[in-house]
Swiss-Prot record:
One CC-aspect GO term: endoplasmic reticulum
Lineage: Eukaryota, Fungi, Dikarya, Ascomycota, Saccharomycotina
One of the record's GO molecular function terms: dolichyl pyrophosphate Glc2Man9GlcNAc2 alpha-1,2-glucosyltransferase activity
The name this protein goes by in its record: Dol-P-Glc:Glc(2)Man(9)GlcNAc(2)-PP-Dol alpha-1,2-glucosyltransferase
Localisation: Endoplasmic reticulum membrane
């Protein structure tokens, strides 16, 4: 009797193990349950180590390397001190962003200073971004999305994104601008307070984020499209007819205007009033931030995203796919190369700040590569890089698109149960918002690519293919080979940390004087 019982239990274990392993192609399988458990375990183990790393490096940077206001901090700190003195109507005309970060810094100052009286004002203000980056961002923003899409990304990786972590140590606007707009996205995807309250909360966070960076109003539009699209997919039954789905989205927006569109429309109306009052999207010094047609900016953005996402896509098959595309479409590829060269020639804006400020990596990238006087480098070297980066950006998106059956609707009843994926409609919206956000900017600033990266990365999953070897399925009759994305997700984390450590070492060790500045200057993104 016991033997039968043990045999039954053993059979149940085998059945459970087989159920956990899913056959995704002939001879190829994935153990999704194990991948999820491993991902959660890695995040739980790595997160406290990251906390220690960022706290220690913050202390080292603030006390030993830059205990003084660095670059734009003199404007941000100065304006916050003005508010501390109660001068709420006084504004530094050189500041171009809204006062959100100064108000947040003010609140943090009144909370921290009575407890840690020996801490300097600069340290307390910088602490705003550190706390946001290592606590609020991974726990309140990324964690809820991760629980819905544990195979897509690791919170410990995204909180370590190199373009973002630079500002954990400084009093800049980028960290909280990112946190708030992505919190708005998180509310739409996870609906933590139900389908109505969550949308209003999402709109609230999006509106507040515009007090930190004006261009977040564009991302508010993208989030609104998602808020309308996800219930429309089910209620209007999206199918393979692309144009029909656009119409269904529009009709659903009208049908449920008060719950899905009105919350965001309030933000748009308020922003329109701001534009009329200010006569520009830019506050303060408008002459140095006048909008233009800087189309090559999209190639800069795609190149940065491609480099940072290298562990996600790199494989022999991916490179073969690019070569195959060139072979199959040689004429189209030729004209694409010509188009990129023409964009480089006629739509490259060289801002005076870019050529004059050697405290940014973009200064060196532009002089030695992007804007090199040699046509061989500027055109014939950079054009293939831009072309491949655009291909990589779009190709990684392609298999992550939510597709539909021509007739049969999705077997899902609630929007909250939809996968964290975009349709052809929202992919188009994402690319459009990315271009509208960065193309008008005359400045080549990598921090402008933080949000385009995050909005792209959250909706994709990394490849499960081997990095070097070809993926060969098991032969017929043999057990299928099991593939996993865990190694690549872990590599993504290590890849980011490599950038973080290298840039931190450069920032710490490389210094030089400026005649107009009282302290030594250093290099950041």
């Amino acid at each position: 009797m016991d033997a039968k019982k043990n045999t039954g239990e053993a059979n149940n274990d085998v059945l459970e193990e087989e159920a956990a392993i899913q056959l995704i192609a002939p001879g190829i399988a994935r153990n999704l349950t194990q991948e999820v458990i491993t991902g959660i375990f890695c995040n739980v183990v790595i997160y406290p180590l990251l906390l220690i790393y960022f706290v220690l490096t913050f202390r080292y940077m603030t006390t030993n390397i830059v205990p003084y206001e660095f670059i734009d901090e003199k404007f941000h700190v100065g304006q916050t001190l003005t508010y501390l003195k109660g001068k709420w109507t006084q504004w530094d005309p050189k500041i171009t962003t809204p006062p959100g970060i100064y108000i947040l810094g003010l609140i943090n100052y009144y909370c921290i200073k009575p407890i840690f009286k020996s801490w300097s004002t600069l340290t307390i203000l910088r602490l705003v971004n550190l706390l946001g980056g290592i606590i609020v961002f991974p726990i309140l923003v990324l964690r809820p999305i991760f629980l819905f899409n544990a195979l897509g990304f690791w919170p410990v990786s995204l909180m370590s994104f190199p373009l973002m972590t630079t500002y954990y140590y400084l009093f800049y606007t980028d960290v909280w601008s990112t946190i708030l707009i992505l919190q708005s996205l998180s509310c739409v995807l996870t609906l933590p307070f139900g389908p109505v309250k969550s949308i209003w909360l999402s709109a609230f966070f999006a509106g507040v984020s515009c007090l930190f960076r004006q261009t977040n109003i564009i991302w508010t539009g993208f989030i609104m499209i998602l808020a309308v699209e996800r219930p429309a997919i089910l209620q209007k039954q999206f199918n393979t007819h692309t144009f029909n789905n656009y119409l269904k989205l529009f009709i659903h927006a009208i049908d449920d205007f008060s719950n899905l569109v009105l919350p965001y429309m309030i933000n748009f109306v308020l922003f329109f009033i701001y534009l009329i009052w200010n006569r520009s999207i830019t506050l303060g010094d408008k002459s140095s931030h006048s909008a233009g047609l800087h189309i090559v900016q999209i190639f800069y953005c795609f190149t940065f995203i491609t480099v940072f996402s290298l562990p996600i896509w790199i494989s022999r098959n991916f490179m073969k796919l690019y070569k195959l595309r060139i072979k199959r479409k040689p004429v189209q590829t030729f004209f694409e190369f010509i188009g990129i060269m023409l964009i480089i020639r006629y739509f490259t804006k060289v801002h005076p700040f870019l050529l004059a400020d050697n405290r940014h990596y973009t200064f060196y990238l532009f002089r030695r590569l992007i804007g090199n006087k040699s046509r061989l480098i500027k055109y014939f070297f950079m054009t293939p890089i831009y072309h491949f980066s655009t291909f990589a950006y779009l190709e990684v998106m392609r298999p992550n698109q939510l597709t539909f059956h021509p007739i049969t609707p999705l077997p899902i009843k609630e929007p909250v149960h939809l996968p964290i994926q975009l349709t052809h409609v929202s992919w188009t919206a994402l690319i459009t918002c990315t271009m509208v956000t960065i193309v008008p900017s005359p400045l080549f600033e990598p921090r402008y690519y933080i949000l385009p990266y995050f909005f792209w990365r959250i909706f994709i999953t990394c490849s499960c293919e081997p990095l070097i070897k070809d993926l060969k399925p098991a032969k017929e009759g043999e057990n299928p080979i099991t593939i996993s994305s865990t190694k690549r997700l872990f590599m993504e984390f290590l890849w980011f940390m490599l950038f973080n450590v290298v840039t931190l070492v450069i920032f710490s060790k490389v210094s030089f004087p400026w005649t107009t500045e009282p302290y030594l200057q250093r290099i950041i993104w």
